[in-house]
């Protein structure tokens, strides 16, 4: 059975320091098929050029790089979603990473139950801060008052 495409969308703004690590974490995934859509949001540093170099280095067509005038991460993220072809959308900020098993495990959960609308995992800090990022346990009432779901979570494209 053919596995569904996962579209990883990444807004990029002055993220030269972390971008390669974020992209490498996606490429190192044990899941296929993936597409990685990078939208540079008017970076003043070398982020856009680095993104282009990473796409060329991957040489698989999996990474697509776009540029827009600075409009903020939400606009860049939504633009990336408009370009995405995957059944599933996974936003990943340019200063974040994803584990190698996440996509396979998240797709399995979502394919097994159409009622599941979002899949996310525990998170850890890296860089200057270390340790576990303590997320509140999921509850509908808490979600209505305070979003405890991190941006790096998998959604059905049809629900975006």
Question: Residue ranges of each PLM-predicted region?
Answer:
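Nucleotide-sugar donor-binding/catalytic module of glycosyltransferases
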Residues: 1-160
